[in-house]
Amino acid sequence: MITIKLIREVYNQNGVFGTMHIKDTELKKDIVIKTVERPQLPKGWEKLTPTQRMKYCIPTGQYPMKWKFDTDLDLRFIIRGISTWQIMHFTGSNLSTTNVIKVGTQATSDGNVKGGVQVLKELSEYIKELMLFGFIPITPQYKFFTLEIVNSPTYHEEEFGEDELEIFC
């Protein structure tokens, strides 16, 4: 089973406004992931409030955001922002059933994370496609994925129901 978790976006001194961690639950360590390309942020962006930053985090399709992950899993995908993050391409190999995949997504402008939930659903669909075309081996432990929302300041259980969504292949 692969668990995909939604976490809030992260800002740091380099201006990277998204993060993704792959947790190896057997080795008890995080695999370091690096971004190699991101949208151009304005000078002085670090002084902007989170609300002001959001308009730069949610572009209207003028440019894609490319992430390259320097990990043993060789994960690469392109994220394009419209009204929410949408995963447009995903490739992976050598995925382990012990890995927890956490995906950081930007909330929509009205402050909810429905878009993040949609991203996770789309990610699961891409994983299914990779299985279909043989990029990920179809084995019994890959029969379903658990999608879980965690650490979201705008998450409301009464609005979204259960905090785990099982996507069956």
Locate the predicted segments by residue:
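Cell wall/extracellular polymer interaction/catalysis modules
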Residues: 1-169
